[in-house]
Amino acid sequence: MSLLKDSTVAVITGTSSNLGFNIAVRLLEGLPDNKEITLVVTSRTLPKVKEVISDIKKYIVAKIPTKVNKVEFDYLLVDFTDMVSILSAYYELNKRYKHIDYLFINAAQGVYGGIDWTGAVLEVLQSPIEAVTNPTYKLQKVGVESGDKLGLVFQANVFGPYYFIHRIKHLLENGGKIVWVSSLMSSPKYLSFNDLQLLRSPASYEGSKRLVDLMHFGTYNKLEREHGIKQYLVHPGIFTSFSFFQYLNVFTYYGMLFLFYLARFLGSPYHNISGYIAANAPVAAALGQTKQNCKTASACTRSGKEYLLEEEIDSTGSDDVVSYLDTLTKEWDEKLKDQIVNTRQP
């Protein structure tokens, strides 16, 4: 249990990412100064946890000094491609907390193999704005399974977090809020209902975000009706993410940034570029400033002034997706029923 009495508890998955860090600091800024907050940082590795906690502490001192004595830090080591790791995280939270106020599902994983540079050049020449809004030149590996014999991207981005929520639902009951971070690129075209684990998909990351959209629309009403939990769906727009930097050199990185700013100048509302602006929708949702029956996007004007966009989603197939996830959940409940884990091992 938190050392801070009656503290507000927030769990942010993928906190060490650009978006995760900015969700954390914006949430701290958005909560009242008299609120004591326990921020549960998550990552797959202990060094990343230590680094992001240090970065958030520095931000608090520099930008929100009124929160210096109001924030307590905790951490979870969790890998959503490992069901035993998810079970371990559940045990830790269940031991330490009686209630969780905010859960941000921000952790995301792709199985990228690089960039089709010929395709990238052609896309940029033919339609530069589309090339940096809905790119098709990012190469993704096909058929990658996790150690649990599930589609790796499906497990990391959809089923792993879904199962995690299933396990900790009692901690979120009666007022807890869940914020799922989806993507601008989650069109129905990326998902085949004959391949829900995305093992045959050449766009498994985008397909996983389509699954997140459908899962939300198939569950948010029931969560609120039966458990008093409010669930929201958001996307951060387009911003500089650390995950793809390994495929860029200094020239291609600044070329990408130039095209981002050009797209924004030409009227794209989604090229936020800044991780801080990208975190607007996730935090606004957590603070009750968005609707549950739509997808809310972080957006900005040409000058970088942030605002929110509401997007309607085609929810056809949401019941089928939830049924599939629930069947898998029951299977893994059975597989893990005798599992005992040592939970704080880095």
Swiss-Prot record:
It comes from the Eukaryota. Glycans are attached at N272. Its EC number is 1.1.1.270. Keywords: Endoplasmic reticulum, Glycoprotein, Lipid biosynthesis, Lipid droplet, Lipid metabolism, Membrane, NADP, Oxidoreductase, Steroid biosynthesis, Transmembrane, Transmembrane helix. Its main location: endoplasmic reticulum. The chain crosses the membrane at residues 242-262. NADP(+) binds at L19, T42, K48, Y205, K209, S241. It is found in: Endoplasmic reticulum membrane; Lipid droplet. It is a single-pass membrane protein. One of its GO terms (cellular component) is lipid droplet. The active site is at S182 (proton donor), Y205 (proton donor), K209 (lowers pka of active site tyr). Gene3D superfamilies: NAD(P)-binding Rossmann-like Domain. Pathway: Steroid biosynthesis; zymosterol biosynthesis; zymosterol from lanosterol: step 5/6. Disruption phenotype: Leads to complete loss of both 3-keto reductase and oxidosqualene cyclase (performed by ERG7) activities, compromising all sterol synthesis. GO terms for molecular function: 3-beta-hydroxysteroid 3-dehydrogenase (NADP+) activity. GO terms for biological process: ergosterol biosynthetic process. It catalyses: 3-dehydro-4alpha-methylzymosterol + NADPH + H(+) = 4alpha-methylzymosterol + NADP(+). Induction: Expression is increased by itraconazole (which targets the lanosterol demethylase CYP51/ERG11) and by zaragozic acid A (which targets the squalene synthase ERG9). It is an enzyme of class 1 (oxidoreductase). 3-keto-steroid reductase; part of the third module of ergosterol biosynthesis pathway that includes the late steps of the pathway. The third module or late pathway involves the ergosterol synthesis itself through consecutive reactions that mainly occur in the endoplasmic reticulum (ER) membrane. Firstly, the squalene synthase ERG9 catalyzes the condensation of 2 farnesyl pyrophosphate moieties to form squalene, which is the precursor of all steroids. Facilitates the association of ERG7 with lipid particles preventing its digestion in the endoplasmic reticulum and the lipid particles. Heterotetramer of ERG25, ERG26, ERG27 and ERG28. ERG28 acts as a scaffold to tether ERG27 and other 4,4-demethylation-related enzymes, forming a demethylation enzyme complex, in the endoplasmic reticulum. Interacts with ERG25 and ERG28. Also interacts with ERG7, but only in lipid particles. Belongs to the short-chain dehydrogenases/reductases (SDR) family. ERG27 subfamily. This is 3-keto-steroid reductase ERG27. The lineage of its organism: Eukaryota, Fungi, Dikarya, Ascomycota, Saccharomycotina.
